[in-house]
Every structure is written in C-alpha cells, then in structure tokens.
Amino acid sequence: MKKLLTLLFAVTCVYGCSQTQNPTDESKTARIPMVMVDGELYLDTGYDSTIEGRCGVMDGEITSTVDGTERPIKDNQSNFGKDIGYQYGTTEGTIEIYQNEKWRIFATEDVREQIQSEHKNDIIQTE
C-alpha cells in the first residue's frame, strides 16, 4: 500500500509540473492599446502628436470597450476605454486620440511600422 501511495504521489508531481502556464499565452496577456475606426484597426505608436491649434471638433468618439487582452471588433471600440474623442491624423492611416491631456498618435499596422522605423532612424542619426 505504501509503495502504491508513493507511486501515485510521484505521478501526480510529474503531471502537475508538466502543466505550467505559458506566460506568452495570447489570450491572457495585455495587448497594445488599439481602436477600431471605420473598419480599420489603429494601434498606439508610442508617440504624442506635436500638432498645435486644433479645430476642437472631434471626428468621432470611442463608445465601447473590450478587455485589455482582446482586439476591438466593432467601430469606435477600443481595448483601453470609452467616451474618448479622436480626430483623423494629418498622415493617412493615422488617428489622434485625446487622452490624459495629450494627443496620442494611433496608426494602422503598416503606417505604425513606418513611423517607428523613421523615428528609430532619427535617433540613430542624432547619436
């Protein structure tokens, strides 16, 4: 009986150790802030807008939200909050979202990569 219990305990330990959670499990990790506008997904670029003298009229408003681990699937839906205004950016493929008294630049995936690449090149040239 003692051997059987020892064997059962060992099997349980081995099985339990093999059931570790994957920290990169996409369904449970926070995603980059993003919003769906006009059927297009816009992602946070990490940059604030430098445009001054705005008209003050919003082009739209984020009206619904999903969990921070999800991707928005409806227009005017984000994964970071709602009741937030936005304006279309001066660069095609961008919108600017007013948050925390700053205008944050969001862009489609392709445009976001361009912006980040250009910014990276600017940093390299100034060093």
Regions found by a protein language model. Name each.
Residues 13-16:
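C-terminal motif of bacterial Sec signal peptides marking the signal peptidase cleavage site
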Residues 18-20:
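Bacterial signal peptide processing site
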Residues 7:
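Short basic-aromatic helix/loop recognition motifs at nucleic-acid
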Residues 26-94:
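Mature extracytoplasmic domains of secretory-pathway proteins
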Residues 98-127:
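C-terminal partner/receptor-binding element of secreted or periplasmic proteins
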Residues 1-4:
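Positively charged n-region of N-terminal signal peptides that target proteins for export
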